[in-house]
Amino acid sequence: MSKLIYLDNSATSFPKPDVVYDFMNDFYRKHGVNPGRSGFDAAVETEEVVNSTRKMLTKLFNGGNDHNRLTFSYNATDSLNLIINGLVEKGIHVVSTMLEHNSVLRPLNMHHQNGTIDLTYVPFDEHGYVHPDDIKNAIRPNTKFVVVTHCSNVLGTIQPLTEIGKICKE
């Protein structure tokens, strides 16, 4: 292969800056153990690096003072599955769109097909936009959550999340 041109940046960030490779190489050579696994030096140091990173990310994302509320996951799919499966309970209603990634559609459809949740997909227009009024009309008394992608990497549409968020708060 001559020159690699990587266009699937949603899957991962590649190539990474050299400083990232250098840090990871150094980290795995010095601290490549499970954090908090026991009291030996490398495990304690690894736990300190994880907690320090968690604190920095909590600050970056304006997460308040409790850095333990920030959860690390394998990737975006894992994160979305953790959130969706953690919120699902028998008898709830969920609102979403068919514009969502499979990491949203698959667990929602599975829970719907199993009879655990009632699921409403709101339509989108010919340009790929979801209209906030359609979200509002789909919400029921037992609606527990609404899942709408902010920006489609397929269509490039940016959904009006501020308006949708206000509707959800009502």
Residues of each region from the PLM?
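Pyridoxal 5′-phosphate
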Residues: M1-E170
